[in-house]
Amino acid sequence: MHFRWRARRDLLSRHAVTSPFSTAWLRGDASALSFLPDDYRHREARARAVAAAASRAVSPALLDVLGAQNARLAPSPARERNLALLAKPGTVAVVTGQQMGLFLGPLYTLYKAASAIVTARALQEETGRPCVPVFWLQTEDHDLPEIDHCVIPRPGGGPCRLALELPDAATSRAPIAHRHLGPSVLPALATLRAELEAEPHAEEFLSLLERAYRPEATLAGAFTDVLSSLFADEGLVFLDPRDARLAPLAAPVHRFALQEAGALSSVLAARAEALTRAGYTVQVHVRPGSPLSFFSPDALDGPRYRLDPAEADAWSLVGHPESSAITQDALHAALEREPLRFTTSALLRPLLQDTWLPTAAYVGGPGELAYFAQLAPLYAHAGRPMPLAIPRARFRVLDDRARRWLGKVGLQPDEVNVPRDALLTRLATRDAPESLETPEALEARLFGAFASELERVAGQVSAVDANLQDALRRTQGTVRVAVSRLTGRYRRALARRDATAAEQVDRLRTFLFPEDAPQERILGLPYFACRIGTRAFTKRVLDACVPFSGDSKDLTP
C-alpha cells in the first residue's frame, strides 16, 4: 500500500485545533507569540536552541537508569546507538511524551512519537549535532479515566469502546506507574480480536498487543513494550521518571518548587491573568501559594495530593480524606529521606525534564502548547532557557472503506465535520426526488412573511392604541418560537427520511469525526494497524511528518 498526503485547508478550524491559544499561535497572531515565540519556524532560532542545549550534559546516574530502563524493551541497535550518543558531550534531545493509554490510546500518541523522531533527524541534519528523540512516559499522572480505554471503528461501522474495569478509576489518586492491568484486560483483548481478526494484518498487531497487555503487567509497561516495538528501527529512547533510582535526581526540582512556592505562584498567577486579558483560556490553574509538586503521604505508591498553605510553616493536603496537614520541616525531611513520595504537576514536569536532559525542543499537541504559554516565568525564575516548542504533526486517515463510503454519499471529508442532523438534512434535501426546501429557507420564508406583514400594520395598530406596541412585540416573539419549533420538527423529519443515508453518515462520522472530535483524538491505532499493517502504517506516518510544520494532512492508503 502507498500513502499520499495533502495539506488540509482547514488547519486552524475548530475541528483541527481544540485550543484557542494554539489556534492563534499556529496562525502567527502577535498576541499569542508574545507569550510563546514561534522560534521553531526560524532556522537561526533553532540553531541557538540546539547550541544552548548542547552545553548541558546528561548525568552518569541518569544514563545508568536510562540504559537499564531501555534494556528491557524490544531489541533495537538504533536505540543502543542513541543511548551511547546521549553519553557524549554536545548531544541534544528532542522530547515528547504522553499518558499511558490502553492499547496506546488515541492515534496522536503515534503521531507525537513520529514527530519527535523526524524533528530530531532534521535538527541533526541542520546543525550537525547529534540529536536523540526521547519519549517521556507520563507515569506520575493519576488520571485513569483518560487512559483506561481505547476506541476503534468497527469495520462495518459504529464505534467500539474497549475499557478496563477499574472500579476506583474515577477516584484514584495514585500515579499510574503502579497500576496493573488486571484480569479485565483479557476480555478487552478478546473483543478487539473478534472485531478486527478479519483484517489483512490483524494477527501481527493483535499478537503484539496480547504479548504486552497481560493481567500482571502495568499500564505503563505494556504501553512502552508496544510503542518501543513500533519505533525500534528509529531508536526512540524511553524515560520513565517514576523510578526509585531517579527520585534523588528529581529532589532538587521539588526542593525548588517548595522553597519558591510563594514567588512561583505569584509570577504564574500574573502570567495567567495576562493570558486571560488577551482572551485566552488558562490551561493549568495555579493555586495561590501552592507548590507545583504533589505529595504522597500514605505510601510511595499511594494517592498523591496537592499542597495548600495552611497555618505558618504548614501545608494542607488538598482532598485528603482526613483533611491532613504536614509541617514544612516534615515535608523537607520527607524529601531528603523518601524523594519518591514527590511527583510533578503539569507545569513542573517540563522543568524536571529539561533539568535532566539537554532538551533542544519539545514536540507537543495543542493542549501542551497552550500550557507552554504559561511556563516562561517558571523557567526564568529557575534560571533555565526554555526549549523550542514544536507542534506535532496532525493526520486524518482516509482508508479505502472511508473513501468508498464518501463516494456513496457524494461528500468530501470535511463535509462530515458538522452536526449529524444538519448533515442528514442536507443529504435529504439534496437527494430528494421532489424539490424540498431546507429548514433554514423554510424558517426564513415563514417568519419573513409574517414579520413583513407585522411591520406593515404596526403603525396602524399603534396609532389606535400606543399600548399595543408591547403586544406587537410579544406576538412577534411568540410566532418566532412557533416557527422555530415547526422548523425543528421539519428538520428532524428530513433527517429520518433515509435510513440508508443515516447509516452511511454514522459510519463516516465514526471514522472521520468520532464523538464530534478530530479522528486522531478519539480513535486508536488497532484498526489501522490491523488493516494497513503495523510497520506500513508507522512508516507512512513517519514519511508524512514534515519537520517544523505542525500541519494537518490527510493520509490516503
From Swiss-Prot:
Keyword Ligase: yes
Keywords tagged on the record: Ligase
Protein name per UniProt: Putative cysteine ligase BshC
Gene source species: Myxococcus xanthus (strain DK1622)
Enzyme Commission number(s) from the entry: 6.-.-.-
Record-linked NCBIfam families: thiol_BshC
Recorded superkingdom: Bacteria
UniProt similarity note: Belongs to the BshC family.
Presence of the UniProt keyword Ligase in the record: yes
Residue runs in coiled coils: none
Any Pfam family matching the protein: CC_BshC
MF-aspect GO terms: ligase activity
